[in-house]
Amino acid sequence: MPTKLEKVLYTAHVHTTGGREGHSTSNDGLLNISLTPPKAMGGAGTATNPEQLFAAGYSACFMGAIKHVAGIKNVTIPGNAAIDASVDIGPIPQGFGIAAKLVVSLPGLDRAVAQGLIDAAHQVCPYSNATRGNIEVDLSLA
């Protein structure tokens, strides 16, 4: 059973035409991008693709979740904290699926503290909550 939102804080609106070889624009005009399949999938690879957008969204959201739990735990996140995200796409029995990998870099933090932040962030991050039990997600500390 899906978890219902208690309250809507924000709604993103994007209009897409053409699918993987198309164009996406947000209603506020801040997102205005062309899409092409990557070369590895037979495309031109001259523009971004849904997997790159998912990787960007998940990594940005996950860093926000790390900062959120760090604030609760009174831990200062280093200014050079970063996440390297990768999203794989491939066949599954019923069509196609994705898998995500996030490598979190929290330089200067004790490894146990950093891992605790990653684990806690994975419980509150909206992308983690959306993907949990649906796709393979690999989280690691750099």
What is the meaning of each model-derived region?
Residues 1-56, 63-142:
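Extended beta-strand/beta-hairpin segments
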